[in-house]
């Protein structure tokens, strides 16, 4: 089970976007995540008339290391760490380390 999943709200803890918040749009297999509005890069796109793509400079999100983000805890309004807890029925859930509340409610 991963600590950071798709649609989690995260805070960037290191790098040029430190302190910014965003939603995880994709989790890549090499321990990287794509967060909306974070790590924006400019890509020089060639026009492709067959696909209907216009050329120019396109801004898009680049992947960021999962170790450089922390999950956002809405109750404390701060970045938090993720822990795991096994319920009595055998299911494993993610919890916030600071207060023990379940992330996947």
From Swiss-Prot:
Keywords: Ribonucleoprotein, Ribosomal protein, RNA-binding, rRNA-binding. SMART domains: KOW. GO terms for molecular function: rRNA binding; structural constituent of ribosome. SUPFAM superfamilies: Translation proteins SH3-like domain (SSF50104). It comes from the Bacteria. It holds the Pfam family KOW. GO terms for biological process: translation. Coiled coil: none annotated. GO terms for cellular component: ribonucleoprotein complex; ribosome. Gene3D superfamilies: 2.30.30.30. Belongs to the universal ribosomal protein uL24 family. One of two assembly initiator proteins, it binds directly to the 5'-end of the 23S rRNA, where it nucleates assembly of the 50S subunit. One of the proteins that surrounds the polypeptide exit tunnel on the outside of the subunit. Part of the 50S ribosomal subunit. This is Large ribosomal subunit protein uL24. It comes from Teredinibacter turnerae (strain ATCC 39867 / T7901).
